[in-house]
């Protein structure tokens, strides 16, 4: 399976000067000690699934995140299945036989230099992405001719708390300028047309756009919601941003482990 990936390391560099609790602390951004950053996922699509392990860098350092090799990585589920991951390249660990399923609870265990980090995520029920359309209002900002916005269309199931993350690929390249994470707190049971806002310079007529919709659990949503605030991206850009996002990974690591469903559509921008 093509790695969908979470790609949150770049957002972590501006957070690496704080500890894992919610209290704001002041540290020297140039000399903050590196922290382990773990990105992992299990989906309802066919495996293999990937766990990436890096170390954070100081705020003013180059965006070269040292890979953590030689870690022991295992993912298990609530039915007794367990998969020990293989390191295929520095810091990249992949599963062998694990198959994700909606409703399953998955536990990630990572051991680095005798320190063990654990995380747990339950995969929600699948919600299908029905279609992707475009809103072209014209009169783009800064004199641009186009102001094209992608819209994800789907029906939210009633009576259930649902959380969604959207990942976009433009002409095969993942769009990483924004974080798209939403809850159904105000839209429960409704037909949703979700605007996926981005700077108008990123979409042009004729581009091939793929939109993947993830159904994520509440802890993963909280992580990306807070990360978008802290990094000034996405729909949750507020002045009262937390110093660092609350992660579902224990023992002081940064990052997130997500078990989620995937529903995707590929369309040509018009």
Predicted features by range, described:
Residues 1-9:
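Bacterial N-terminal signal peptides that target proteins for export
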Residues 10-14:
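Hydrophobic helical h-region of N-terminal Sec-dependent signal peptides
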Residues 17-20:
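C-terminal motif of bacterial Sec signal peptides marking the signal peptidase cleavage site
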Residues 22-270:
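A sequence/structural signal for flexible, mid-protein segments enriched
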